[in-house]
Every structure is written in C-alpha cells, then in structure tokens.
C-alpha cells in the first residue's frame, strides 16, 4: 500500500468537495470523531475544513487516543514523532509507544518538550537503565521543580546528589530550583553559585546568591573581598555595585580597575574621589604600565596637573613606565629635565638608556646631565648610541665646548681619551692631531702627553712635518691660563724637534720665546 496512495496523501493539500466520508476513510484522510484531515503548509492541518491545528499538536492528540493510523499520516506530513509519544504517555497508550520504541532510541530527547511533571516522570521511566539520580538531573535541567519536591526526603539524605543538583542548577541557570534547594535543605557552600554567576555574567543569579547568603546571616568580609577582586578584574560594574550593597572596600575595585584597564568601571567611581586618591591611582597606573586610555582618564580628572611630580617621576623611572610622560608632553607639561635629573642621579646606565630611547630624548641631553652629576658610566653607555667610534669622538668633542664646569670637561676628556685608546692605530692617526689641540686648549696635560707619544710612532716621513705643525698650532692656542705641565711638554718637544733637525735654532728660540713670554 505504500505506494501511490501514500504518495498522494503526503502531497495532497486540497481536498475535492466531491470526496465524501467513505472516500476519505478509504484514502486514510479521515479521523474518527474529528472529521476530515487536510494538510495546510508544512506544519499545520485542517480538521473538518474549519479547525486549524499544528501538526505536532494533532500528533499529541492522536497519540493520546492511540490512533496509529492518524499518527502515521501526520508523520508523513512532517510531524515530530516525539509529540505522539507525549500524547501516548498522557493517555497511557503503551502499545503505541512500543510500536515506535526503536525509532525513538533515547527517550531523554523527548523530555524538553514535556510541560507537566507527571508525563515527564513517565517518559523518563521508559529509559530502563536510568535511576532516580538521572531523573532528578533532568528535572533540574528542565526546571521540573514538582519532581524535585516529590523526592525531597531522598535529597535531604543524599548530600552529594543535592550538591550536584545545585551546581547543575547554577550551570543551567534554574533560579527556582536554586532557591528551593537552598531554602529547604541548604547546600554546603554557595561559592560555586557566585563563581558560575560571574563566569556566565548572570547578575540575576549573583543577586540571588547574596539574598540566600543574607538569609543565612553570613556575609564574610573575605568573601566580599574575593568577589570585588573577581568582578572588578573582569570589569563587571553592576556586579561590583551589587557586592558593595553588602559591604567591602572600594579601594579593591579601583586597584583592579586600574590594573586591568577597565575605564568604564574606573570612570564611575573617579567622580566621587578626592584629588589625592586619584593621584595615588595614577601612581598605581604607572606601576602597572596601564594603557594610554586609562592614564588619560586619570589625568583628565586631575586636569593634567600633577602636584606630586617627584613621586611620579620616581615611579616612571623605577618601573620604566614612560607613557605618562609622553601624554603630559603632548599637553605641554614638560617633565623631561626634572625626570632626567632623578634618572641620572639614582638609576643604572642601562635603565637610563632604555628610558632615553622610549621618550626620544637626545643622547647629548642625557650626557650633559650625566656629566653634571659625574656619572661616567652613563656618559660611556649613552655614547654607544653612535656606533662608529670616530663619530662618537666627534660628537663628544663638540660637547666639550658647551660644558661650563671644569670638572665636567675633565671627565668628558677622560672618556674621549679612553675611546681614542681603543681605536685601531690607523684610525688613531685620523684624529690624534685634532685631539692634541683640544687637549692643549683644555689643559688636559696627561692626555696631551700620551697622544704626543703616539705621534712619535708614526713613520719619519709623515711624523716630522705634521708634528712640527702641531707644535706651531699649539703655540697659538696656549694662553696665560695654560697650565705649567702643558708648557713643559711643548718645550720638551720643541727641543726634541730641534735635536732631530726638524727645526732650526732660530725657529726653536722663537717658539720658546712665544711659549714663555
């Protein structure tokens, strides 16, 4: 019979008026006690040509009556077999259920469609290998509180099952079940409820947790602290506000908001804070290397005016967190000089170099401050920004003339001479005569004496004329302020040049006269 008749029944949407009851019965399009059946669209039927029902509701009714012929017809019309089983359970039509048992497979799949507790329990009973625990888990999942109430005595004796159901109710967000379990039997620990509420961002469950906790007359300070830390770390403003209703320290919230860059949370509370408190938060933001937007938010509430400059600079340098300085520079609040002074005085050359690179401070500016504070290590380390040694010497040489303090000049010349001594001999020759004149001008006798020795190491053809010219140039540089040691060195080499017959006696006498006039 499958065949043409079934094919017709499946696709027949319009019944001809000439079809009488007998013809409809023969076609299987007649429902006893109800009337003719006609398909309407994909998911509805028409009974007696005037009553429209959903296909699944009709299946439930047919199942309740145990009318397998109508069930088969409605299944052809894309009905869901699960509704036929629900109806069969409501009408105790177990013969019909057994006919479709193999097609169902797992009766648990039907449970979400069932509205009443009695049918729910009867459906679960069809699963032969499931016990009470499984029934109660599914009752929790689908919010069948009456079933749980039926088994209240058993739950009160089985603590593990009770705790499990409570946790499942949290995961499935079944508030009525949560309330009933806690109020009738209590659970060992409500922390699981709060943890799940926070992870699911479920404010309703979170609030319910505090209601249940308050009913116990137990709001521990440690628990409030933990909740404030967790919710503020995640930026959950409304969870934070809910917690603060029951107590807790707002400083915890602000600390977490700064640490995790939750500006919405921070902005909500900043309006209520005094200036000193905001300045402390700014220091924390520097310490935690907060984002640009977080720093801008804090600074905007301070009108970009920071009173505790020294402390701010100490934090910037100590935690190598220079972003706040960049922001203030854009607002024309120049803290570079003040920061450099602190930085050079107290911190290592490596740390100074790192901050210099971050803030794009010129090396010359850092070196001058380091010379002022007599930090030779910083001068040397910073000068390595110029990779070429000859360039380093040239840059430092130019700086000598801009330094006012004699002790600073001497220190810089020592650094320069150290760089010179590390040059290859061929490279030394390129700068030795220029440096020698600088040393004479700056009364650097020790360095001048040493560089003159290097000049003697040149081959004779190059040495004699160039060294003679160096002595003549130095005579033009010497002044009344030149130290006695420089004069002695010049005298020695002038006499030496005369001995080597590079100078005439007349030239020698003239040079010595100029030297000591």
Curated annotation (Swiss-Prot):
UniProt xrefs under SUPFAM superfamilies: Pseudo ankyrin repeat-like
Record keywords: Late protein
Regulation: induction: Expressed in the late phase of the viral replicative cycle.
Function: Plays a role in virus cell tropism, and may be required for efficient virus replication in macrophages.
Family affiliation: Belongs to the asfivirus MGF 505 family.
The protein's name in its UniProt record: Protein MGF 505-2R
Species for this entry: African swine fever virus (isolate Tick/South Africa/Pretoriuskop Pr4/1996)
Lineage per the UniProt record: Viruses, Varidnaviria, Bamfordvirae, Nucleocytoviricota, Pokkesviricetes
């Amino acid at each position: 019979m499958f065949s043409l008749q079934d094919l017709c029944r499946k696709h027949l949407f319009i019944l001809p008026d000439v079809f009488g009851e007998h013809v409809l019965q023969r076609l299987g399009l007649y429902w006893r006690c109800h009337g003719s059946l006609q398909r309407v669209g994909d998911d509805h039927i028409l009974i007696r040509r005037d009553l429209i029902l959903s296909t699944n509701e009709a299946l439930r009714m047919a199942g309740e009556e145990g009318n397998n012929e109508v069930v088969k017809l409605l299944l052809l019309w894309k009905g869901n077999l699960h509704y036929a089983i629900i109806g069969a359970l409501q009408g105790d039509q177990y013969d019909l259920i057994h006919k479709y048992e193999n097609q169902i497979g797992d009766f648990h799949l039907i449970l979400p469609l069932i509205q009443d507790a009695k049918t729910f329990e009867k459906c679960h009973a069809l699963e032969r290998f499931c016990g009470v625990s499984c029934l109660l888990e599914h009752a929790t999942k689908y919010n069948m509180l009456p079933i749980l109430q039926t088994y209240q005595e058993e739950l009160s004796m089985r603590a593990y099952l009770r705790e499990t159901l409570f946790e499942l109710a949290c995961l499935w967000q079944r508030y009525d079940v949560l309330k009933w379990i806690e109020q009738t039997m209590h659970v060992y620990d409500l922390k699981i409820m709060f943890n799940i509420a926070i992870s699911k961002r479920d404010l309703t469950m979170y609030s319910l947790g505090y209601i249940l906790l308050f009913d116990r007359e137990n709001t521990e300070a440690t628990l409030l602290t933990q909740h404030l830390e967790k919710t503020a770390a995640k930026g959950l403003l409304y969870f934070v506000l809910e917690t603060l209703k029951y107590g807790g320290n707002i400083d915890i919230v602000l600390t977490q908001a700064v640490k995790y860059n939750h500006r919405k949370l921070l902005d909500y509370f900043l309006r209520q804070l005094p200036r000193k408190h905001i300045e402390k938060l700014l220091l924390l933001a520097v310490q935690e290397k907060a984002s640009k937007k977080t720093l801008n938010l804090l600074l905007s509430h301070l009108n970009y005016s920071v009173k505790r400059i020294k402390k701010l600079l100490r934090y910037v340098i100590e935690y190598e967190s220079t972003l706040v300085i960049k922001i203030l520079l854009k607002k024309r609040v120049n803290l570079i000089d003040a920061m450099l002074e602190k930085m050079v005085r107290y911190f290592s050359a490596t740390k100074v170099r790192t901050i210099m690179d971050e803030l794009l401070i010129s090396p010359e500016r850092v070196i001058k401050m380091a010379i002022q504070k007599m930090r030779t290590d910083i001068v040397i380390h910073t000068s390595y920004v110029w990779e070429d040694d000859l360039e380093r010497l040239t840059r430092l040489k130019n700086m000598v003339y801009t330094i006012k303090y004699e002790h600073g000049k001497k220190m810089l010349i020592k650094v320069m001479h150290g760089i010179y001594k590390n040059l290859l001999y061929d490279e030394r020759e390129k700068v030795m005569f220029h440096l020698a004149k600088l040393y004479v001008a700056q009364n650097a006798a020790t360095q001048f004496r040493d560089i003159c020795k290097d000049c003697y190491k040149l081959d004779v053809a190059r040495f004699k004329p160039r060294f003679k010219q160096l002595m003549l140039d130095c005579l033009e540089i010497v002044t009344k302020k030149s130290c006695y040691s420089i004069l002695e060195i010049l005298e020695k080499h002038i006499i030496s040049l005369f001995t080597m017959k590079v100078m005439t006696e007349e030239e020698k006498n003239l040079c010595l006269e100029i030297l000591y006039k």
